Amino acid sequence: MNFLSLFVLVPMVMLLGLWLAKGVKAVRGVMVVGSAALLALAIYLTIDFLGQRAAGNDAEMLYQASFTWFEPLKISYRTGVDGISVAMLLLSAIIVFTGTFASWRLNPNLKDYFLWFTLLSMGVFGFFISIDMFMMFMFYEIALIPMYLLIGVWGSGQKEYAAMKLTLMLMGGSAFLMVGIFGIFYGAGGETMNILDIANHTNGAHPIEFAQQCIWFPLTFIGFGVLGALFPFHTWSPDGHASAPTAVSMLHAGVLMKLGGYGCFRIAIFLMPEAANELNWIFLILTGISVVYGAMSACVQTDLKYINAYSSVSHCGLVLFGILMLTTSSTVGAVLQMLSHGLMTALFFALIGMIYGRTHTRNVNEMKGLMQIMPFLSVCFVIAGLANLGLPGLSGFVAEMTIFVGSFQNADTFHRVLTIMATCSIVVAAVYILRMVGRMLYGVCTDEHHKQLTDATWEERLAVICLIFAIAGLGLAPAWMSNLIDSSVAPIIETVKNAGPLVSSCNPFM
């Protein structure tokens, strides 16, 4: 059995264990063992991958395996990973592990909740190990379907509305994506769904005509971009985050939204380089709007989850922004931003859930003096805010600076003006983060109920500390992760840049 398949097999075993489990303790035990096993697999994979790269193995994808699943459409179960995939698998494993402890005391129906949560996790892991377009799409759908029930049943507020809105928007994106994938398949000769074969024009695949690329590129980019909160398709995100239970918000913002950026790079840009060079300016404008609009929208919110949700729109916009700049540095920064945002937004949502569970409010104006009442949670909240601001020594600084420096390497005025506009989001972020921290944590608490609140429990402390260590580790020692990502990004970006547009640029700003 292929090693990578364990990332799908372990969640399957977890599903069986949860189905057979009797009682809350058994359910928790299955989740702890399963999520710990996934984290151990991800750590081992990362170490072994780095070792193989150091030993000179420069293959595009490692640990490849395949078997034919549906011959008429050339669909196969194909697995393989590069540095980007390994980074995303590690992120996913960390958040599944910490999300398990963040949901420790969830009621009611903890068993059913973890069943759907595990199915969602399986879809995410399967997506990142797949190198067959259809298998990626299948796991993508597996990851989306549980979201409706997890929000609609275990959510809060306008949960039914938020669940339906999220499902309809993401399924609409899936429709674009399916058309784009089959367009790529038939445009490349209809012989293979293997991403590497299509990119390298092997095993019967031939180059996709430029005219076809200009049709399928926007469809696939929008299809994945909807999940990445691309403006103006982002409106599902704030409502979905605000209504989702804590661990679902963590996995949703921390990992699920990264499927969008990963898919845009892996399929849209990698397989259609000429169209990417020709049409990227359109989506650069949209992502630039996402970055600034998300940050400014966060400034006018008073609900903690909405603040973090709009902040996520801004940060995920920055991921797509870095990818579309088509430089090695900006793309490495975009992947680092996926990691950084995944960790810090998971930390934020975990802390918001813990605070809400005690105060029964998410309104910033209804909380004061929490630093004296819940010092552990408050200090962790400050750390999450500083990571969001891009404080040196934490993950946000490394990711954002790499994106901005890489973006500015484009010598033309259009790209540089957009980069300068995007950097303004850092200033705006300072407004909503510092205001939120100041109002919530300091001052004199006048609410008698709040004065009786307790600090974090042991399982909450474990989840939060794991995330903080990961954020600090990435910020203090980013070189190993940057090298891991660069080994996979650099050859792809070089290929894309060498392809160039096949017609004179249609960008009116160039």
Language-model-detected regions and their locations in the chain:
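Alpha-helical transmembrane segments and their helix-start/interface "positive-inside/aromatic belt" motifs
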Residues: 25-36, 161-171, 374-379, 458-466
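Cytoplasmic juxtamembrane regions at transmembrane-helix boundaries
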Residues: 101-116, 246, 448-459
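Hydrophobic transmembrane alpha-helices and their helix-loop junctions in integral membrane proteins
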Residues: 98-104, 122-134, 148-439
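Central hydrophobic cores of alpha-helical transmembrane segments in multi-pass inner-membrane proteins
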Residues: 5-20, 34-45, 89-103, 120-122, ...
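Transmembrane helix-loop-helix hairpins at membrane boundaries of multipass inner-membrane proteins
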Residues: 2-3, 17-101, 105-115, 191-192, ...
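Cytoplasmic/organellar membrane-interface segments at the starts of transmembrane helices
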Residues: 374-376, 433-510
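Membrane-interface helix-loop-helix modules in multi-pass inner-membrane proteins
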Residues: 61-87, 133-136, 140-148, 389, ...
